[in-house]
Design a protein with these regions (language model features):
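Membrane-permeabilization and membrane-interfacing ectodomains
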Residues: 136-504
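Thrombospondin type-1
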Residues: 2-101, 105-112, 124-141, 402-410, ...
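Short hydrophobic/aromatic residue motifs in ordered secondary structure
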Residues: 120-121
């Protein structure tokens, strides 16, 4: 993503009467803990002009402070709307189709050759409603299955980690062409959607699971979000649930744990317990795709919501659009699934049994090389024959009953809803541990419900059609909204944690992940194992300044490495303190 991420203006100069606090809370404080910080918002902006298409007007607000140290989180909408009257007509987009085109009832333009060809090219069947004769179907008499890989192509991505609720593409449109691709595993032919310039089935999988062990929260959380923070300048800011849209996210796209209903609760439950974290992951690739550069067929709902976006920039409404469709879409990528779990192991219980974290890893079967093409029954038999040969445990159930595993966190992506629901139920009930058997069962469902696991991204604004009214303005507004969205939910608004702790912004609340030597909401409580001089403080960036005025087509902004500043041999902030952008 471009590094030109715009920060909303410096807000601390506003008067006290410009702030709105969200529900004061009282919490039981630890000794020496900082005072709780409640969510603090600006007051609402003035109402904007009446939008002629939606006949509504909008206003927005911003977040000044996120909840921290036990304070109330910011999980509120930043947009508001009300009905209004306007004499300005909504632009009528009908009647713009060419002479050689058919105009669908929903406004799409089709080539005349697609009318009455037995396929729903319009999306509302209006091209097939009045046919005295039908043309030869594009695929003739052959039955060609719909490709789930093709349906998934172009999947939206939200830079803060949320799974977009809808796709921008109509990937069951074929433009009257019967291009087929063959799945080498099943020998089944699938029809390639028009939107994909390239679609290929190429099943591959990691030969073995990658298993890593961590001794503290901070290292574990940083590792989980390392890939995201390397791709986008979002540091440790995570937003998995929409606040501007009432559309729920999909199962498996976020965070699920056994004893913890949220990542915040997971951090609280594991803080100060000295666990060992076993991080297990494996990827399965089913195929690859590349989207067309031009003439993409966009979904009717995407175009409709784009039409109703106000031309005057209203931050909250544009945030809602981004949370529905993504800040970016996948221009090309790899489709399949990610199997990722974190086991929280009780260090003391391990020691009392004379075991290591690697022993638990073997008992769970993640040291085995399980081929992804294996039959589920055969793979399960192989697992049971080889796993869990330790002096203490004979099988996985004995591991569960021993209390060695305190919690399991699921970061699984892909697989059918039924399979993911079952895994989540196992997590919450603790009736049975999730082990490599469940991986084999999950992998078998990926062809029915794959996701994009690696991608090259393009801003969602690039999908704005030139022919819609105010297309250039709305494209610029979407680019601005992405910058504002990242700045609005930035960890730079969090107060520094104490004693080398790392601040994270999770679901509207600043959380501190502590080093092994401290615990507490702010990492303020030393543990009994604390030895003075063991805590290095890594530097963290403060928020970006406002952009400078535009000169010779360029502008600048700056930030400081003082939130906190590095100390006691800690690392300096990664990245640059000065950013230049075009204007």
């Amino acid at each position: 993503m471009s590094s030109s991420l715009l920060l909303i203006g410096v807000l601390c100069i506003l008067g006290a009467n410009s702030f709105a606090s969200v529900g004061k809370t009282r919490v039981t404080q630890e000794p020496n803990a900082p005072e709780p910080i409640d969510c603090l918002l600006t007051t609402w902006s003035d109402w904007g002009p009446c939008s002629p298409c939606s006949e509504e007007r909008y206003r927005s607000r911003s977040i000044l402070k996120f909840g921290q140290f036990g304070g109330k989180p910011c999980i509120v909408a930043l947009s508001d709307r009300e009905p209004c009257d306007t004499r300005t007509p909504c632009p009528d987009e009908r009647g713009h189709c060419g002479k050689q085109e058919f105009e669908c009832e929903n406004g799409y333009c089709l080539k005349n050759r697609l009318v009455c060809n037995t396929e729903n090219d319009c999306g509302d069947f209006s091209d097939e409603d009045h046919c005295d004769e039908t043309k030869r179907p594009p695929c003739g008499n052959r039955e060609v299955d719909v490709s789930e890989l093709g349906r998934t192509a172009g999947q939206g991505v939200n830079v803060l980690g949320m799974t977009p609720a809808q796709t921008a593409f109509q990937n069951e449109f074929y433009n009257g062409i019967c291009d087929r691709v063959r799945d080498g595993n099943t020998a089944i032919y699938y029809r390639k959607p028009w939107n994909t310039a390239v679609l290929s089935y190429d099943t591959r999988g990691d030969k073995r699971f990658t298993s890593e062990f961590y001794s503290d929260q901070a290292s574990t959380i940083k590792e989980i979000f390392k890939t995201k923070s390397q791709t986008f300048d979002v540091n440790l800011s995570v937003k998995l649930k929409p606040t501007e849209s009432n559309v729920s996210t999909t199962i498996g796209g976020g965070f699920n744990a056994g004893r913890s209903s949220s990542m915040s609760e997971f951090l609280k439950n594991t803080k100060g317990t000295n666990p060992i974290y076993l991080h297990v992951k494996s990827n399965i690739q089913l195929g690859t795709f590349q989207m067309r550069k031009r003439d993409l067929r966009l979904s009717e709902t995407f175009l409709e919501e784009l039409k109703f976006l106000p031309s005057t920039y209203e931050k909250g409404e544009y945030f809602k659009f981004l949370e529905t469709y993504g800040t970016h879409y996948s221009q090309r990528g790899t489709v399949g699934g990610k199997y990722e779990l974190i086991y929280v192991l009780d260090n003391q219980t391990l020691s009392s049994h004379g075991l290591t974290a690697e022993d638990v890893n073997r008992c769970l079967g993640f040291n085995l090389g399980i081929t992804i093409a294996a039959d589920v029954a055969e793979a399960t038999a192989e697992i049971k024959a080889k796993q869990c040969k330790t002096s203490r445990f004979k099988n996985v159930d004995e591991v569960r009953r021993s209390g060695v595993i305190q919690d399991v966190v699921s970061l699984i992506q892909g697989g059918t809803t039924a399979t993911l629901t079952r895994l989540n139920e196992l997590l919450s009930s603790n009736a049975r541990l999730i082990d490599v058997e469940h991986y084999v069962e999950w992998a078998a469902t990926l062809p029915q419900a794959p996701v994009v696991i690696r991608q090259e991204l393009t801003p969602i604004s690039e999908l704005v059609p030139l022919k819609i009214p105010d297309s250039r303005t709305k494209k610029e507004n979407l680019d601005r909204a992405v910058e504002d969205y990242v700045a609005e939910y930035s960890v730079c608004k969090c107060q520094p944690c104490l004693h080398g702790g790392t601040a994270m912004l999770i679901e509207g609340k600043c959380e501190c992940t502590c080093t092994p030597f401290y615990k507490g909401d702010a990492c303020e409580i030393p543990k009994s194992t604390f030895v003075p001089g063991q805590t290095a403080i890594d530097g963290s960036w403060n928020c970006w300044s406002n952009w400078s005025t535009c000169q010779n087509g360029e502008r600048q902004r700056t930030r400081e490495c003082n939130n906190p500043a590095p100390g006691s041999g800690g690392k300096s902030c990664p990245g640059t303190s000065v950013e230049t952008g075009h204007c």
